[in-house]
Amino acid sequence: MNRVLEPELMTDPEQAEAYAAADFATVNQGFVDRFRALFPAFARGRLVDLGCGPADIPIRFCRALPAVTVTGVDGSEAMLAPGRRAVGAAGLAGRVELVRARLPGLGRAPGGFHAVVSNSLLHHMPHPDVFWSEVARLGRAGAPALVMDLHRPESSERAREIVETYSAGEPEVLKRDFFHSLRAAFTLAEVRSQLARAGLDRLRCEMVSDRHWVAWGQLPS
């Protein structure tokens, strides 16, 4: 199946609220736990989360790592609005900064972060090289980086099977988004080519489920 682009931003308030209300606890906590297992020495500093959505992952990082501050970046105000409420409710307004920006327009200094993470932003990007360039630019030399995203299946039929397997009980708007996201995602081979073009081929890239891949490692100098 060829890649089919979906909208870069989730701007519909109904769509964003449905996403914020959905139960991604297992996947999101697994992402944080994976980071801690891969980079056990990382315990303090500034972490940036690209495509933070409603800020569940920034909140989980702050709870897991008390000496870490998080800058969450998302291009959609509709997604950040529930995120700001969640950060306030968690009592983490002093440690979580939420910024509305579209890559490459974040405007932060090169090497300004001690760690870079992103879960499920890449498939929204029409030009993936922009994403990887920002990962390389924002993290300082040796910074841990962890990126996870969907893997594009071989056919639309397989994509529908995955949606029904993992989202059967979710609202139709989320099931539709999941299907479109699978079609917009990249294959493992495509991601490895992107990493090579960005000078990030030292990052490891592997499948971790039937629908997710991760790329991880320390950023080059």
PLM regions with names:
Residues 150-198, 204-206:
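C-terminal alpha-helical "lid/dimerization" subdomain adjacent to the S-adenosyl-L-methionine
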Residues 143-149:
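Conserved beta-strand signature within the Rossmann-like core of class I S-adenosyl-L-methionine
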